[in-house]
Curated annotation (Swiss-Prot):
It is found in: Nucleus; Chromosome. Belongs to the class V-like SAM-binding methyltransferase superfamily. S-adenosyl-L-methionine binds at Y1443. Residues 1006-1017 have a biased composition (Basic residues). It catalyses: L-lysyl(4)-[histone H3] + 3 S-adenosyl-L-methionine = N(6),N(6),N(6)-trimethyl-L-lysyl(4)-[histone H3] + 3 S-adenosyl-L-homocysteine + 3 H(+); N(6)-methyl-L-lysyl(4)-[histone H3] + S-adenosyl-L-methionine = N(6),N(6)-dimethyl-L-lysyl(4)-[histone H3] + S-adenosyl-L-homocysteine + H(+); N(6),N(6)-dimethyl-L-lysyl(4)-[histone H3] + S-adenosyl-L-methionine = N(6),N(6),N(6)-trimethyl-L-lysyl(4)-[histone H3] + S-adenosyl-L-homocysteine + H(+). It comes from the Eukaryota. Residues 1453-1469 form the Post-SET domain. Its EC number is 2.1.1.354. Component of the Set1C/COMPASS complex. This is Histone-lysine N-methyltransferase, H3 lysine-4 specific.
Amino acid sequence: MAPHEKGVNPSESPSGSLKKAPPSGPKALRGFASPSAFRNAGIGNGLLQHRGEDERISFAFPRKGKESLDRNGERPAPMSLESRLGPPVSRFNRPVGGDSLERGNGKGGWDNRDERTSASSSSIHRINKEKIRPRSDFIESSANLYSEDDRNRDRGRYHERDRSRGTNGDRGGGEGHSHREPGRGKEHQNGQGRDRSLYRDHSRERESSRDERDRYSEEYKHQRSKARFSPSPSPERSRLKSSLGRHRSPVSVSSSSSSSARSPPPVQNREPLRYNGSQSKNGEKELSNGLLENSISRSGVSIAVPRKLETKQLVRPSPPHVNLKSTIQDNPSPPTGKYPPSPPSLDILSKPSCNREPLPDQRPPTPPLPENSSPTSPSLESSRFDQNQHLLPDELPLPPLSISFPQKPVSSSSLSRLSSLSAALSRPNPLDKDGTSMPPSFHFREISNRHQRLSPPNNAENQLPETSIIPPPPSETVPEPPWIRPPYIPPPCTKHRPGIGNFFITNLREKVEDKSGKEEKRVDGMEGGKVVQVTDPRLSMTEEQRGRGRGSSKQRAAFYELTYEWDLYSVTPKPPSPPTAVLITGLGPLTTVDQITKFLRPHGRIKEIDSKVDRKTDMQLGICWVKFEGPPLGRPGTAHDVASMAVKVCDGKKISMGGERIRVVLDGRGKRAEQAVKEEMERRYPPKKPSALPSDMKVTPLSGTAMATTSRPPNAPNASTPLIDKQTFDTSAKAPIIRPGVLKPLGQKMYHRPSAPPLVFNNHRFRDESFLNRPFNAGAGMISQQQMGYKILPGKPVQQLASSFTSAPFVRHPRERREDSWTNERGRRLKGESSTRHWRARSLSRSSYSSYSSYSSYSEESEEERPRHPTKVPYPQRKRLATGPSKEDEYKMEDVREAIRENGHPCVFIDAKSLPAAREYESRQSHLGWYILFADDTTAYRVQRVLDTTAVQGHRLSLVVHTSSGPRAQTDASEPVTGGVGESKKGNWRYLTITKKSRPMPAVKKSGKSATIRRKVYSPSVSGSDDDDEQVPVMAQNRKRAPSYASSTSPLSEDDRPFARSVQREERDIDKEGKFSLIGKKADVVSVKAAKGPKSKTIRVDSDEVEENQGVPLASIGEVTKAEGKQDDSTVVKLETLLSESISELTKGKKRPTKAKGGKATKKVRLDQEADDAATKIQIDEDIVPQPPKKKKVVKTEVDKLLASGVLMDEEDAYWLGRVLAAQEDGLEPIWSDGEEDLVDEGHPLFHKSGAWRAEGWKKVAQVQKSRYLPQRNRAVVNSEDVGGITTGRTARLAGRDQHRQTAAVAANNTVESDLFAFNQLRIRKKQLRFARSAIEGYGLYAMETIHAGEMVCEYVGDLVRATVADVREQRYLKQGIGSSYLFRIDNDIVCDATFKGSVSRLINHSCDPSANAKIIKVNGQSKIVIYAERTLYPGEEILYDYKFPLESDPALRVPCLCGAATCRGWLN
């Protein structure tokens, strides 16, 4: 049973210590026995055994009740166990000296036997090593108990057994037992007559012993895991355990099973432990109860047994239970101290019995007791026993735990150490409260001298205790001083051997220069037997050199800038990454991109390649920029490594067949490429050198008339200041070139301020040729060009710019307001400067920078090297949007609305948020965006469909179509413009009902002569300074413009606004075509339709109202004087503004303006027409007298009253109210369509009989029917009568002849060489194309740039198959539901199938009036399908060509044509 189950502390369990034998009783004690188990178990000759790791000790105690006596009537002598080697053994296995562990005649003694080593089972129990035997601290106690009667009855029978049995036989211990010899299956003859019932009882007992042993083995494992970590009860006891562990072997009580059947075979080459009993007088051993160790134990351990000093005989102590009764009476009371008492002495083992003489006291002398203390008897620890402790004597202590004995016996020489330890333990404990000291815990006996040879002193001291014993604290020792290497002492004498030692070649330099020189050595610092004096080379250095230092200790003369690797926490901008691109120059003009790619592909993967071309001829410049993505797959490295390798390997190589050697350099950011292109273009197209002025040309002062005209009034302090400073012009300098009609050079001021130097545009890249081409009329009194020092060039016609999507001309305002950064004064400068390139005049509707090729992308870093004007910034920042629109923005927005209302057609609005940063020359839009006007209703939708979300310089355009809410432009000038809502005549307002059937009406072209309205504006010059308080009249000059331009300005100019500094003239031109294309900031297009008239007319507009300097917008009211015949009277009709945009809506930060739907005029004008049918005459008033501004009260109209009352909320409500009033005047009742469904006719494709779309199911609508109701579709249905009339009429014949002449001319010029040239140019630079929804059917292909007639558009590519395969594929495509056919027949055998393998060229739709044609050419023996332009294609125009399908006779197989052209045949085949 485990110790913890009986209340025994595992740390104090009796493992490894000698335990008192339990009282007599019928039961056997096994395992760990608590004190209560000792009391309850009365056993006879019990056996207690302890098993250690390498030793085992067994001894027996006689029974208390009937003590067994020897033949002399005395108690047996004390037992004595020797080591596992035992006494000296002879060759015949006999101990030397006659000590044999043999059983005698059964009377308790021992005598010598030859081969027998077994003992009597009546007095001892033979110990067997079990297979399940655990480690040393496991205790197993078992004994076979018999009654005394049984032992006396079987004693004689037992000793009469046959002595011929094997000496190593292991039999059970107990008389009357059945003994079985090893290897023999029969029962011993002496045991045949014993009692069978006793045999069965003993068999059952053996079985139970085996079961308990198995159970104890499992309990041992659990006990050992706890005992390893159990603390020691007290420091004193721990020291005692350590001391006992070093000097004594552990003692344990154990017994094994008596069954010989379970005994394992003996261990070979191991001598048994023999017991020496007391000898008789005649020299024979006295038989006594003793202990026998079998031969299979792990290792033998000797226990010291005391001897008599007189006879030198072993003395066997009496068992502890002999004086049990007397001991109980003398049991002292347990101590009450704080600390537990020391364990009692072990001299109880040597206490003599009552029949023997007491042994001499071998204990060390008791130390003297301290003063005022009385000796006290030792007491047992009260914490070790349970409630039945009073039944046990004092002399039965529990020995300490796990006290391990050494494997060899301890010699007597170590008694002195033990005595000193005992004396130390017997000293008084200073921690006791009463100051008394305890006696020594143990008294040690002298160890026999016969074992000295087996236990040397050093072995006993070197034994270590078990792991469970806490070692004593080490003594404090002084650390030894560190070891110091002794100094080296050379030997007393050394002899130098010649030729051996360190040497130095003295004539090394001479040897190198002259190979025949003999080498001289200096050995051991001696030359010629003399020691060479060595000098320090540093002494030869100057003081400056020594102060500066050398090597790592060199001092710096100045501070060095430290550089660190850039990371996320650096404050400086991130440096550019290592270059991964190269620039190749020196290429031949015929070198293609494929050749360059093939040449560079082995070095790495190419990410981008840009071959620079001439922008005028689209030919190669011999410059190519290549960017690498990385090394080839499977190779290590980076793109920078590839670029560096390409520079090393490819520089100076040849690519093309021309033999030109290329030059390759690193160019990571493309700056070198830009510079190379610039230099090459300047080399090809050098700028023209301006002609020098004559030496006699001088700058003459201004005349008085000019001074009076251009200067301020006389009351100004600086009125006499000339217009142009004399220091501005230098006679020796080259004069810039100026166009005819220009008043002054660009950049020159017209006012009395320090003028800026004139801008010379010959070498300036940022200029606008279209502005220079615009004429200016030189008025009277202006400065002559000869006086200003400019050379007059011969005049030439104005350059015609390419039109936009609708061929509408572009207009630009010649000037705008800005700050002068040179003089830091406010003023105005002409805005003709442009940052477009000097080799090409760009269209204003497109980006200002054209891409070099389709492969390249624009680099912002290249702009750092571009020349620029000191005051011109090519990339100004976008203006910060204020919280609300300013007054200037309101004026601009009003002008835009007026232009939209007068145009009357839908317009496209480009949101300013989608535009890139505004440049100076592009600032002609309102603060909300750009408005683009067109001459018809369909162009705006087409432009929005094609160009919406188009990327321009990295920004996506956002196009929104705004439908004009105002009336269409008036075509009859005889109808006066009314200012009231009720004054509208019948027909002016067209009542619209918004339904799906309604389609926009086409614009009607009006014919008539153009008229020019000249307007004279008198405006005060307002300024905050003293010298700007005067008014300067400016005369508006007449000019005649080119027919293709629509020149117009804002009706409310900049200088008519608050705080304007000067006067600006305004002109309004009336074009008979009435077309506009662009409305920009500070330049608003206003369409004024000239009316039909048989007579010439003279129109004069006088401004009789000017604006006050109070921040109120100027209400310009003009007077139109009509002279009819000779009549002098004139009628003035005043116009007033009816409605305006609500200011509060603009201040709320709206992103887009409210759709202008008002159809009313903003001014009242009285127009008097002349009856004469003559040319238009312009009258100029010579005498112009500025008049002071007049305040005029604005008369409120009916509309103003409605707005004030809240009936009308905005301009849109007023517009629809006017429509309703106009319909009432016509006698029409308004039709309110709210809540009504849009009904269609029965013949309409969308008509449904059931009234519900879902009830009709799904059906396919033909493409022809879709064109009837879809607004984005063309009119595909063409009447056959109209077609016949057109084809047979005179107009058709004329058109056919003209087309035939053009075709013949193109055919004469287009040869095979020209086609190949065009094809090669397409491979160099592809045209910019885009596919989008087509108005004909499905998707279509649109041109994104201007493509002139005869130029190649694209190539029709696809899969080339045979004709039979094409027929099979066509049927399969029809079954798969692919309705479109992309099969293009090249000849009778080959067909190009672009259904799954094609480009955007397959999306080109058919048209009976095509804009392109397809040709089949051969390149290197291979047929190519190439699309050429028949006429000029403008950006946004769809590319169409005639499919030329063969005609079908069967009407069921014919495909209707949806092109909607005037010459449409109606069918494709």
